[in-house]
Amino acid sequence: MDVTSSTVQLNTSDGKMDAHVAQPKEGGKYPGIVVIQEAFGVNSHIKNVTERIAAEGYVAIAPDIFHRESERLIPYSDMPKAIATLQRVVDSKAMEDIGAAIAHLKSQSNVKSDAIGVIGFCMGGRLTYLAAAHHAEDVKAAVPYYGGGITMGNPSPLSRTGEIKAPMYLFFGAKDQLIPMDQVGQINTELTTRKVPFQMKIYPEAGHGFFCDERGSYHEASAKDAWEKTKSFFAQHLK
């Protein structure tokens, strides 16, 4: 499906926030999906993912969670700066940003306002989990990829698991040195205990960032399998 992309500006309590929007060229009404960035900004990878999602028949939006920063794009080679920047992200502010993106989707005439999903990677994986709880009335499907720190924070996203209403598909790599497998186990246990409908896939040969083909950690077989599962999951719950 052919897509068109653009940048829109959304209002937040801290000023304007850019968001990358991709949507099918063909008319009609489509589900909406919020794409939440890694700790490197709304870069070419995140824009590409947004456009790939749109090509499957969705209106996709990637809000710039770093809009409060002077540097909003960080190269993959500068992990210290990425970590320092993500540590300045305040959960409540990020939830406001994601809420603005959801509101934008719901306001569009070509979006099915009752069919909104969220997907995120790395930092965005954690925020996807949190958004499924914080925006539970709007989020109908959530897909966190290698969300580090879900068990961390005050309160942690994990502590809000009981608020989640949407089905969730979580992806991790067994060789992820940033997300210990005991954390993944805690997430699995809490989702099960709270009776959240979820699926989880752990790729034995994949590390952190395995889905991003611009990173050295890209693992093609795992990325392709996860993408097929993601497409099927969103189609099942949003279409």
Predicted regions and their residues:
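N-terminal cap/leader regions of alpha/beta-hydrolase-fold enzymes
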Residues: 1-239
